[in-house]
């Protein structure tokens, strides 16, 4: 999985080199964290809890969810989530669905990569636990190499 932060696309490279391309939203401002991560957990209809940093940054928006939010259509993680780890450390970064499809193509999240529900549902079924996710820097573009 590769996220082109400049073009706002996620590429899923399949066996044989065929790639699927999906539009995404990335994190606002300096909250985007480029790097290479491992997808160690996949969840259908995940619950969501804002991180302490999110609550501190925007308490008026997130403090009410400090104890978490159940799965459902208004949950910020949507219908599926892929959990990104750095080694054995949960980064709290996710590739997930979004109940806000209009955000796709922009910078909208607090760190995660957002997809429309239909796209994350399909990607979820195709990506295995242990797969690598590359979140490319916002100032770079992905180029093909021979």
Language-model-derived ranges and their functions:
Residues 1-94, 124, 146:
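Gly/Pro-biased beta-strand-loop elements
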Residues 30, 45, 101, 139-141:
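Short loop/turn segments at secondary-structure transitions that flank enzyme active sites
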Residues 85-87, 98-100, 118, 138:
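Short, loop-centered acidic/histidine patches that primarily coordinate divalent metals
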Residues 95-107:
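Immediate flanking context of iron-sulfur cluster ligation sites
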Residues 78-80, 91, 108-111, 119, ...:
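A short pocket-lining beta-strand/turn micro-motif at the edge of beta-sheets
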Residues 90-91, 97-98, 135, 141-142:
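Short leucine-rich amphipathic alpha-helices used at interfaces
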Residues 113-146:
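N-terminal targeting pre-sequences for secretion and organelle import
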Residues 26, 97-99, 127, 139:
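A short beta-strand motif that forms part of the nucleic acid-binding face
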